[in-house]
């Protein structure tokens, strides 16, 4: 078992098989030592999407969990990009988080903490940079979408 798998087991997290892209694009791309993960939606292991506007149909806590599910799907894509060897991953460089919300919503950062907190537990060496943006809508009416960049050895 590699170091990342040991950490995941310790915090009781399983990386899912990631969902297929919902459009005509690659789930990830690689440039030198960087892996760019396309936007990941909160699609659960049973194929359901957590949908709706945050603080209207989705609570803050549900949105945070959706962000965690989205970053787990990103980790699933990363695992494929690394031929199942997550020890190749040096760090998470950046997370871009998009929140489907009403105009007066301002807790975007709290929502995306659902993803950042998990990444910090796994890759505790370096914190990643991040942006949290509010949107009027997202693909498939998802409540959250997470895009990420990782560095590999």
Question: Language-model features: where?
Answer:
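Short, polar/acidic, helix-capping and beta-turn segments at strand->helix junctions
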Residues: 1-153
């Amino acid at each position: 078992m590699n170091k990342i798998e040991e950490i995941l087991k310790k915090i009781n997290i399983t990386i899912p098989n990631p969902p297929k892209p919902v459009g005509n694009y690659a789930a990830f791309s690689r440039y030198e030592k960087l892996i760019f993960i396309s936007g990941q939606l909160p699609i659960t292991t049973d194929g359901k999407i957590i949908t709706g506007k945050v603080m209207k149909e989705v609570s803050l806590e549900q949105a945070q969990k959706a962000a965690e599910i989205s970053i787990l799907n990103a980790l699933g894509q990363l695992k494929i990009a690394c031929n199942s060897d997550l020890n190749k991953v040096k760090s998470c460089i950046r997370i871009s988080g998009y929140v489907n919300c009403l105009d007066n919503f301002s807790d975007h950062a709290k929502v995306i903490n659902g993803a950042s907190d998990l990444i910090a537990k796994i890759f505790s060496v370096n914190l990643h940079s991040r942006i949290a943006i509010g949107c009027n809508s997202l693909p498939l009416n998802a409540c959250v979408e997470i895009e990420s960049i990782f560095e590999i050895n």
